[in-house]
Amino acid sequence: MLYVVGIGSGNERHFTKEAEEILNKVDLIVCYKNYKKFVERLNKPIYTTGMTREIDRVDYALKEAKDKDVALVSSGDATIYGLASLAYEINAVKGYNVDIKVVPGITACSLASAILGSPLNHDFVVISFSDLLTPLETILKRFRCALEGDFVICIYNPLSKRRKEPFLKAMEILAEFAKDKDYIIGIVKNAGRNKEEVVITNFKDLYKNLEKYLEFIDMNTILIIGNSSTKIINGKMITPRGYLDKYKI
């Protein structure tokens, strides 16, 4: 059996009870090398690979799962930019016929939203700015459509030291929409981990101080761009559900 397990931020308190139980019972844990530190406490054999070796990692986990219980670990939730879909694909393409069970985890957008206040309390869109697997033009088209629809937008993988173009082009698009209104932006770096940092600002500040933010934002950062209703209440970023517009209190 292959268990595809989401471990949230990796912090022990963000492991679900089910994830903890599964990881304690399996024979082998397979994960990205930087996540090894999150599961070493379980005292299980661990197999790791580096960045861009996802196919090798998943294939190895499936082969091992033919005759033992294996946990394939993803940060956050394995079905949200995680390895769950790849496990199902490889299992089918290679005809392994391994039983697969996905164990949900706390995804970064949910965790970041709670840290910021409640910015995802109405309709929202999640977009990854990584163009390793998705063409840049597709990313930017989706981003523009989300702005046109007045969705709150949660951005994964906003930029890295070598990959700034998607973020910069997206900010140019956002600047077009910000001519007549400003956007509240929440930034959470290392959500739920050591050295967690939180910034609530607005687009005008971000765009004016872009170089500073380019140094601050990285692949471990979540950006949440508010919609036209998003506001700051007592220092927290809030997107109202609409109750007070409809009901008197």
From Swiss-Prot:
Gene3D superfamilies for the chain: Cobalt-precorrin-4 Transmethylase, Domain 1 (3.40.1010.10), Methyltransferase, Cobalt-precorrin-4 Transmethylase, Domain 2 (3.30.950.10)
GO biological process, one term: cobalamin biosynthetic process
Entry keyword annotation includes Transferase: yes
Molecular function terms, GO-annotated: methyltransferase activity
Signal peptide stretch: none
InterPro entries associated with the record: 4pyrrol_Mease, 4pyrrol_Methylase_sf, 4pyrrole_Mease_sub1, 4pyrrole_Mease_sub2, Cbl_synth_CobJ/CibH_dom, Precorrin_MeTrfase
Pathway linked to the protein: Cofactor biosynthesis; adenosylcobalamin biosynthesis; cob(II)yrinate a,c-diamide from sirohydrochlorin (anaerobic route): step 3/10
Record-linked Pfam families: TP_methylase (PF00590)
Tree of life domain: Archaea
This enzyme's EC code(s): 2.1.1.-
SUPFAM superfamilies linked: Tetrapyrrole methylase
Reactions mediated catalytically: Co(II)-factor III + S-adenosyl-L-methionine + H(+) = Co(II)-factor IV + S-adenosyl-L-homocysteine
Keywords recorded for this protein, A-Z: Cobalamin biosynthesis, Methyltransferase, S-adenosyl-L-methionine, Transferase
Keyword Methyltransferase: yes
Similarity comment text for this entry: Belongs to the precorrin methyltransferase family.
Function of the molecule: May also convert cobalt-precorrin-3 to cobalt-precorrin-4.
Name of this protein: Probable cobalt-factor III C(17)-methyltransferase
